């Protein structure tokens, strides 16, 4: 996908919707977008370092493609912000991590793991970085996407949701890639999957889920139409179970082993096979291939 494709998505209605959002919706929109921008910029910088330790040419190629796509995603977020708000508001949103302690802590958790790998460059820190990527791609991104899909189902910011759907398609493949790398390393490097090391990875996953739930309750809580703190918590715990079991380790939690009934709309909004066509663009947005990938996760 070309970067120019991003500007084919019509955000004129979003420009009108944004000032009319409820205060809680607008605050959540700004903070979640700020977090997603950080995650993509982090990935853009981290993936080239990871690729130095991957010897399989085809996997290396996938990592380079992913790094390129993360840059495209950052452009997409910039396009959204440039369209709906002033340059001053845009900069305020981009740099909220400087003034919002919750956002700074979110960034620090994943950033510290990457920094450890850059400093140590050993097998264990590499494994922890791969797990951190899996958490980032499979929990953090998906939880953020959920909010934008909720706005869209309430008839607001539909262009933003469409941008997110494009990004969601890419993240499906990134998630599949990191899962495949980890599963292959389970076979090739059994010393990296001793009970003690698996416990470290499990603790990372639990901490990622805990932080994401706390973040969701902070930015969404019970103040956004169509969502509440319990729905957010249940969905994120479900994602934690889905990701951990996808690595062959069973479930993290006894509850939320299936997708919550009141959150099935998330999958429907992100479902690549759900063909939607923008009347003005007359362009299909079905992505059958990426959905086939995510079904295995």
Descriptions of predicted regions:
Residues 12-35, 52, 93-135, 152-158, ...:
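Acidic/His metal-coordination segments adjacent to aromatic residues that form catalytic metal sites
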Residues 24-53, 72-75, 126-151, 173-177:
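Alpha-helical bundle segments that constitute or directly flank the non-heme di-iron/ferroxidase center
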Residues 43, 49-118:
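Long, hydrophobic, well-ordered secondary-structure blocks that form the structural core
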Residues 49-61, 83-91, 117-130, 146-166, ...:
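Inter-helical turn/loop segments and adjacent helix faces that build the functional surface
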Residues 65-83, 99-102, 109, 136-146, ...:
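Alpha-helical scaffold segments in carbohydrate-active enzymes
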Residues 190-297:
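Extended, helix-rich structural scaffolds rather than catalytic motifs
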